[in-house]
Regions:
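N-terminal hydrophobic/helix-forming segments and targeting peptides
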Residues: 1-116, 149-153
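Alpha-helical metal-binding/catalytic segments enriched in His/Glu/Asp
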Residues: 53, 108-110, 124-157
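Short acidic/His/Gly/Ser-rich catalytic and metal-binding motifs that mark active-site loops
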Residues: 117-124
Length: 157
């Protein structure tokens, strides 16, 4: 069956560019979060998680990435202890969006757990449900999506 509608014209609608851009930014953040939490751990690991966030710099998000050496220097033993269960090196990603352009305003802070796959150590977690441990990074995915939404819509926060 051939489509019978070839064009559509909306009459009387106000300019929707402004509201659309805001909603597009929010939808982009939600989509980013969904994509991150859907990736399997052989695709999404600490380094690739950081790589998938680097494009936020183009939206004006400041990215700070800590590697193993920097975390050790800062005394982040608990995080490094968890990371020892993987052949992949650890990463910690911090993101900053300053929509006010001022440094004297107290920030709003989001913290999200970003363990890309948590086995809990050798034999500490039962095998049943182990595949669900990829969602231990859902908090960091949500924060990454929120930063995308804030920066893409140029939020004043």
């Amino acid at each position: 069956q051939k489509p019978s509608l070839t064009s559509l014209v909306l009459v009387g609608a106000a300019d929707a560019a402004g509201p659309y851009a805001r909603l597009e930014a929010i939808a982009g953040g939600v989509a980013r979060t969904r994509t991150l939490v859907s990736e399997p751990p052989n695709i999404l690991y600490p380094e690739s998680f950081v790589d998938k966030a680097l494009d936020l710099a183009g939206l004006g998000v400041e990215l700070i990435v800590l590697d193993d050496a920097e975390m050790k220097r800062l005394g982040m033993g608990a995080l490094l202890g968890v990371a020892q269960g993987s052949v992949r090196p650890a990463r910690l990603l911090a993101m900053r969006w300053n929509g006010t352009g001022r440094d004297d305003v107290k920030p709003v802070v989001f913290v999200g757990k970003g363990v890309t796959f948590d086995t809990g150590g050798i034999s500490l977690k039962p095998a049943a449900g182990m595949e669900d441990m990829k969602w231990d990074m859902g908090g960091s995915a949500a924060v990454t999506g929120a930063m995308h939404a804030l920066a893409a819509r140029k939020a004043k926060a």
